[in-house]
Amino acid sequence: MNLASQISQAKTGNATMEWAKNYVSKLNDGQLALLQKMYADHQAKLKASEDEKKKKEMEELKMKAQQQAILDSLTQQIPIMVDVLRSSTSPDSQPSSSSSVMSSTDEDQITVKDVLIGKINKAQRQSSPNSSKPYTPRGIRERVLFDEHLYVFDKCSYDSKKRFFRCERKNTCPARIHTPFDAERVIHKVQVHNHPPPTTFDLAHYNIDYGKVKSGHILSLNGPQQTKNLLPPSLLTPKSDLEDETLSTKTEQKNASTMNILLSMTNNCDGRKPITLRLPDLFNKISEMEIHDMEMTLTKFLLENRELRTDLISRNGDLPVFFPNAHNDELVLFVADQHENDSVFQMIRVSERNEKSIRQAIQEHLQKVSNRSLMMNISSKINVPLSQQMIDQWRTEEFIRLDSSKPNFWKIHHVSKLQD
């Protein structure tokens, strides 16, 4: 069956698998490469659409989970992280000068109920400043021992890399120290103490192990976990005057169990180790069975796309265009060896459209040097120097065969049709 009958059979729609096999076997390397490229692009588009669809579904599920978590935190009173402004003295006993009030911001775990009760109590204090209820601090700050003096935790730096401590007598003593977030050493001291260090009798109730005291390091006397244990139950979870004590205890147990479940889930997720895959340096040769499967897949793709069959038949050896949207000033050369019939075209990008840039790009590709200008082959006996006028007539993509057998006489053979 000749080519004309194959074309007529394809146009009439009577294409069979046998016809497709015969047709694909007669395609040259350029046409097969174009067919494979179009098939790969088609598969890539399908995969991209599926990935985008999965990504949207994951985002929707994540958004629903976040909304459900917020709803649960509001209805079930799951602990949330809020900033609590705390002072060491009673609001009634604080002086009017703002400079003498030493307070800072800490992060505590409290419930939505506690926030609402705190706002109600604050409104009551503002409406009745002479309230009969005594002021009680909400917690105990972390205390450390350094250079025979006691320091109280102040705050963390804005980048969460350092912690700031101030002297225990913070209202009268200006001494400060800075420590790293992940180490118990002092990296900076600010000013000096204006009072003598506390006596051994004053530090007796801390049970200090002086054997662990190191020069330049701090010794924690009550860490964040110990601080919570030192607080009485009435300060850990504030209770409303109208709420029963038994009900609040059950609520605390429920919140604690919920937080334990969330922490265990977080720890399990954090324990996952990333897996890194590395492609092999050398790939094994493709077997005949795999080649047959690839040909059958391409044949099926060819049978399903009538426009592709018509496009391949009408090309008739025309040069492919890989960069249709390239700018007119750009130049890409596909270079092959003139003395090898099966030589593969290698892509070379040229920085500027002139002979010097073309020669320099070819030299970098071949790892050779030519001291003379490139020659353009016109016929078997005529070779002329490559001029700027010739280069200006070139397209953005040009196929050439290079004869570099003579060191200072490189000849360029222009390719206009792909060989069958």
UniProtKB/Swiss-Prot annotation:
Function according to Swiss-Prot or TrEMBL: Probable transcription factor. May bind to the promoters of target genes, including micro-RNA genes, in order to repress expression, and acting redundantly with flh-2.
Extent of Low complexity compositional bias: 87-104
Residue span of region Disordered: 87-107, 119-138
Keywords: Metal-binding, Zinc, Zinc-finger
Source species, domain of life: Eukaryota
Amino acid composition bias (Polar residues), ranges on this chain: 123-134
Protein name, entry field: FLYWCH transcription factor 3
GO molecular function, one term: zinc ion binding
InterPro entries in the record: FLYWCH-type_ZF, Znf_FLYWCH
Listed GO biological process terms: negative regulation of DNA-templated transcription
Pfam families cross-referenced by the UniProt entry: FLYWCH
Gene3D superfamilies, alphabetized: 2.20.25.240
Species: Caenorhabditis elegans
PANTHER family tied to this protein: FLYWCH TRANSCRIPTION FACTOR 3 (PTHR37975:SF3), FLYWCH ZINC FINGER TRANSCRIPTION FACTOR HOMOLOG (PTHR37975)
ZnF start-end (FLYWCH-type): 140-195
